[in-house]
């Protein structure tokens, strides 16, 4: 890793045991080819494009940051967290675009608790599994865009969107890598703890400020979010706040034991959110990994 990247990450409060900001990792797949190191620069310009597409009978909104360059570029498809929207982790998205990497950010059907959501659907109709289908459809649409390099499609997700990203990656092919921010692997366990009896689940209830419906519970009640992580064939980089009390760091540590090719970066003095400064710095590192290989 270049000195500039290391300095940025040190400023971000990321713990490191070996100078690569890795706190835990499985064995890595050996490199078979040696490519010239690409120096990441984030001074490029980009164009914002908007899209709509259908998924599960609903019209969904997506926004893309597209670098102003010739030819096809790597593409990152972003999945937001519970109640958020396409603007979630926006500085990560912008930083990637300025580094020459396109970002396609969808708003899930019923996924936003905004008073003016951009996608159709009610929050009470949304679940992790409906979002998995939305993401599958987004991958199909986005990977065929004229500026996207189909051999360099990456997935990125925050919180519930991180869980959705991992579950989706278990079922799709040709994904080059995953970047997950405090992924909600603990969600099914939390649901079972909150509702010991499935037949006593209410029709609607409030979860972290978002009104959700019974389908949200029933769709993941029997899920083991960790069970198939060992089937992921692409590298995974997880970022998780040390002081996260919504999705504890232990959830990602548990996931690391199942993942074959993964890296966990622990963020000091960080809870269940990233500051704009952290987002920009993490976007810089993700760009470095996309250009120079996930470590």
Give residue spans per PLM region.
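N-terminal cap/lid segment of alpha/beta-hydrolase-fold proteins
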Residues: 34-69
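Active-site glycine-rich loops that stabilize anionic/oxyanionic intermediates
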Residues: 73, 79-84
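The serine-hydrolase catalytic nucleophile loop
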Residues: 82-94
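Conserved alpha/beta-hydrolase
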Residues: 95-117
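Alpha/beta-hydrolase active-site loop
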Residues: 124-146
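Hydrolase active-site cap/lid region
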Residues: 167-213
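Short beta-strand/loop motif that positions the catalytic acidic residue
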Residues: 232-233, 238-240, 244
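Catalytic histidine-centered segment of alpha/beta-hydrolase-like enzymes
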Residues: 270-281
């Amino acid at each position: 890793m270049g000195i500039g990247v290391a300095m940025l990450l040190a400023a971000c409060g990321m713990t490191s045991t070996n100078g690569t900001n890795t706190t835990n990792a499985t064995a890595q797949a050996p490199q078979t080819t040696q490519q010239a190191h690409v120096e990441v620069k984030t001074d490029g310009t980009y164009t914002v494009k908007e899209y709509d597409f259908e998924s599960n009978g609903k019209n969904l909104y997506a926004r893309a940051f597209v670098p102003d360059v010739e030819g096809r570029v790597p593409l990152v498809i972003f999945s937001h967290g519970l109640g958020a929207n396409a603007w979630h982790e926006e500085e990560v998205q912008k930083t990637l675009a300025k580094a020459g990497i396109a970002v396609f950010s969808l708003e899930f059907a019923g996924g936003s608790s905004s008073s003016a959501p951009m996608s159709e659907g009610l929050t009470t109709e949304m679940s992790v599994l409906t979002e998995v289908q939305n993401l599958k459809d987004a991958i199909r649409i986005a990977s065929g865009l004229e500026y996207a390099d189909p051999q360099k499609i990456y997935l990125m997700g925050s919180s519930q969107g991180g869980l959705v990203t991992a579950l989706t990656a278990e079922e799709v092919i040709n994904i080059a890598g995953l970047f997950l921010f405090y992924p909600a692997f603990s969600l099914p366990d939390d649901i079972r703890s909150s509702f010991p009896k499935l037949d006593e689940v209410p029709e609607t209830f409030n979860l972290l400020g978002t009104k959700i419906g019974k389908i949200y519970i029933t769709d993941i009640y029997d899920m083991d979010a960790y069970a198939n992580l060992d089937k992921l064939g692409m590298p995974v980089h997880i970022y998780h706040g040390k002081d996260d009390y919504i999705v504890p760091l232990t959830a990602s540590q548990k996931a690391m034991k199942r993942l074959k090719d993964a890296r966990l970066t622990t963020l000091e003095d960080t809870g269940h959110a990233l500051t704009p400064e952290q987002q920009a710095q993490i976007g810089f590192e993700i760009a470095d990994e996309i250009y120079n290989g996930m470590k």
